[in-house]
Amino acid sequence: ARRWAFSRSPLFESYNGIGGDCTNFVSQCVYAGSCVMNYTRDFGWYYSSPVNRAPAWTGVEFFYNFMTANEGVGPYMSDTYPGGLELGDVIQLGNTDGDFYHTLIIVGFLPDDYLVSAHSNDVFNRPLSTYEYDRIRYLHVEGVRADYPIDCFDGFINGERI
């Protein structure tokens, strides 16, 4: 999250201006920690190119649906409560209509707050309490399932390869 908080990885399209880049950014962060994508055609979580990506890679609701229901390869998460959050966990903000519109990743803690990183409005170490929202949900990364050895971090974090 720190490496690309205020810039864009050359490996990924920016979706600012066409719905926002927040979930794309958080997906990149989750991928940096898991190194596994799920290429399931209709219900996957993957990015190969700007035109070959899963809705869950860039869409707030699709991301939530994939992460909380994934039983295949890749990362999986569960709904949790504020006290159950750890570094790398995810927060989503919503409105009174029940629509969730923003995805953030936890990068630190204060005694009574979370520090988050996000894109669309690029931030790093921003206190969650400075956001305005009507609804909130918390996602804890439970783990990652992989069917091959995992080794992608260095090339990925340096913007060299997915």
Set out the residue ranges of the language-model regions.
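Short intrinsically disordered, low-complexity coil segments enriched in acidic
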Residues: 1-5, 9, 81, 142-146, ...
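Generic hydrophobic, helix-prone segments enriched in Leu/Val/Ile
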Residues: 1-4, 34, 100, 116, ...
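Short linear sequence motifs
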Residues: 8, 56-59, 131
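Glycine-rich catalytic cores of cysteine/serine-nucleophile enzymes that process amide/ester linkages
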Residues: 11-13, 17, 40-50, 95-136
